[in-house]
Each structure stands twice: as structure tokens, then as C-alpha cells.
Amino acid sequence: MHRSFLFMIAALFACQSSYSSKFQNEEGGFPEPSVLLKNAHEAAQSFAGVGRLQAAMSCTAFLWKPEGARPEAKALALTNGHCVMPYTDRATTYDIWVNRPASSEWKLILNYFADTTEAQKPIVIQSIVYASMKAVDLAVLELQASWAELEAAGLKPLPQALKSAKAGFPIRTVGAPLGPFPYAEQFLREARCVEETRVSIVEWYWTWFDTHRNSCADIHEGSSGSPVLNAQNEVFAVLNTTSATGISDSCYLGNPCEMQRPGTVMVANKNYAMDIVGLQECFDDQTLAFGSDCPLPGPETVAYRDAPAIPTRPVDRQGQPLHWTVQAENAIWKMGAVGDIDCRDDDDYRREPLPTGELPQENGVYLLCLQKEDADERFPTVVVLSLDTRPPTLKPELSLWYSERGVSFEPIFKVPELSFFWVGFGPQEGTSCETLKLTPYRRIPIHVDKRNLPARICVQGEDHAGNRGPIFSYDVNAEEPSRVLPRNMRPEASGQKPKKHDVIRKQ
């Protein structure tokens, strides 16, 4: 397999899947399709406290109540950090947000069932109590409504699990994916599968430790922030990303990789969730209280700047080696390839200037671990370096559309494998794509006048690291084909839609 948050919302970044929509779970069978929840007869009332979050991205969030919270206290909701933070900013790998105001337009829509839309309950988000994408991808939001007000309306928090689900045991996710569903079905859905294992993952800028893995079906953009529940309907994790829309093993956005020995592996069609068992230990009378029993990183952190792009090549366009340029104040550090290093182990941290030598030459993912002296070893700042010198092998798809004046075309992006294009065209007779001068595609459709048909179109893809693939040729005739789809609408062979970042990141 050649190289590739939930909603991160926006996250934008169109990728398309090259995998089958069916995938085997740990029991050897296939996960059940998700079910649209209906509540006209209160059959799903226990999930009325799960809803559509409209914040920095469109996600899922759910009511979560600290122990001892007073009835008059403002209610809280849980979701992913990437649903409220500017996740395209690399500072999210070390920034911790505590007690920040929320946009006046943000809201959580509860009672979010397809058959009782008139009973929906929109609640304004008052503040961001906590948000992080460092080590964990979680956010705690304060609502304008109190616990007493919500519970009087039949909106109750999900019960908190005291232990994580065991591998092989049944679980379920409840969320509001947008995905491929028609608008009338973009409401709460339940998907069932089994808990598989715990793994640490790397995705683009971020590293997340000890996530829960499952194969529940129909996890799409909008699913970010969905609760993951055990057989007793107790929440133990929060869904944050999926490889179901991944197209390569580059560990890029939308292509999470598991950190194994040696190196990273993208396992197709897997979902990953943040553990929240022990989250109650982070609150004292609904006030944040960081400590050794709290599984959230505190605001004391190591910031850095001047990190390499992801992915990158170890040399520049002229073939000159690239060097480490990362800068961080008062940091101890260590560096190594995924599988060879554990950033959470205090051993081997160096008390010397940060590296300035050449980047490693071998393809793979490397971690530069940063810590402060005597800091909590559970939550290092991690700078991800992804090196890739492999040319993309995917053949670009063209979107064609005809008019009385001729034919226009544009290549279809599949980030990160096909992030840039070089294009050209000439007469079908006598044009060789190997010798034709190609120019950068500027994201403006290219027109071929009907007088120049039939024509030969030549396209070369370039991946996000700057590696160019083979040149492909496409012959276009003067006759309009019987079926040419509108621009940017040509489907994948798999029938799946491009991933947007809700990361479910499209996400």
C-alpha cells in the first residue's frame, strides 16, 4: 500500500477512499450497519443528551456531568478538541485551552432524532472549559443551561463507565454523521461492533496515546465527538478519527497510523477514540483540577516553532540536505523513529541544544520529543517528522465536460497522494507525453477548443512531499461521450465520497 481528524472539522482536505466499505471486525464477522435512531415513543430517550455540535466544525457532543455537580451549575458537554480548536494550526500540538469564551454562534442541538425534529433543543455554548489536541483530543464545553433546566426537559447526561471495555466485548457508538446520508437521515445513528485493542496513533501533526480501536460502521464527517459506550450504556471513550477514508500510509490528515515496532502502519477501516475513564478526577466541584490522577494534560507545556512541513523530503529541490530547525525554550529532548522511541519515558532525554543536523534520510515517521524538567511524563510535546521520497503511483482521474466550444478538463485531487499536478495537451497525432512540456495546474479548468480535437491530455501527479509520479496520457475525441459527469462529481470506484475533515477529521 502506498502512503495518506473527525470533523476536524473542516478539515477540509478532500481525500477519497480506495478501500472497500466492508471490513472485518475482531470477531471475524462484519460490523452491523448503523441504525437511524427514532424517539417518537421515547425508545431512544437515553440518548437525548447526545446531539449535533455546531462550533468550529460540525461534530457530535454529549452531556457529561462531574460527580457532585450542583443542580444550579451550568451543564457540561464533551466532544473533541479539534471540533473547537483551529486544528490546521500546528500550535494545537502543544496549546492547551482553559476557560476561554466561545463564539456566540456555537450551539449544541439535543434531542437530535430524525422523527422528532420539532422537539429539538438548541443550547448555546457559553465557554470552552478545556480543549486539547496534545496527547488527547478532547474538549469540555460549558452550556448556558443548568443541569436542573436540562433534566427537567428530559435531557440527562450519559452515565460514566468506571472501567474501559475489554477487547472482544460489544460496544456501540452514537453520533450524528453527515457522511453519505441524505439530509433527512443526518441525525443520531447507533452503530454496534466490538472493542478491539488499545493503540497509540500519529495523524499529521498529532500523536495520541492509548486510543481505543474499533470497526463500527458508518463513521463519517460529523461523527467526531461521538460517545463510545459499553454494553451497560456507559460512556468510556470519545470517537476522534478514522482510517475509513484513508488512501495511503503517509499518516497525513485523514490517514491515521498506528505506532508499532518497527514504524507506522495504517490499518484500513478502523476508528479510534479517546479514553475518558478517570475524567472525573479532573474536576473538583465542577472546577478543573489537574493532578496525577487526571488524564488531561495541564496548561504548562513546551511550545516550539520552525518545524518541518508534513510530509517532506530529506532534501530540497536542488538536492541539498534539509536540516532540523525546530526551536523551543528551556526544553529537554530526544528523537527517534516511531517504534524505536517512547516520548512518555523519562529516560534518555537530553539536556543540550536542540538538533541542527541533517534530517534522517530513510522514509518513515520520526518523533522529536520535548519536555520540561520535572514535567508530567505522560504528556510530552511531540514534533512529528514524516519523510517520504516515494513517487505517487495513483493514476489521476480527469473530470471532463463538453460544450459547443470544445471540452474542458481538470484533474481530481486526492491529498496527500495527488496534491499538485503538471498538465499539458496537444494534437492526438504526434503528441508524446514524455516529451511535451508540462506546466503547473493552477486549479483553473483547462479548455481545449473544438478545433484542436481530437487531443491528447498529459497529466503528472505530485504528492504532498513534492515527489512526482509517472506521466499519464488521456485521449479526448471531438464526439461528446454518452456519459460525462459534471466537474468534480466523478465518483470513485468504491462509491465513497471524499473525506472532509470532520475528521471525520473530514473529520
List each language-model region with its residue ranges.
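Serine endopeptidase catalytic core focused on the charge-relay Asp
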Residues: N25-E27, Q45-M57, P66, P71-K74, ...
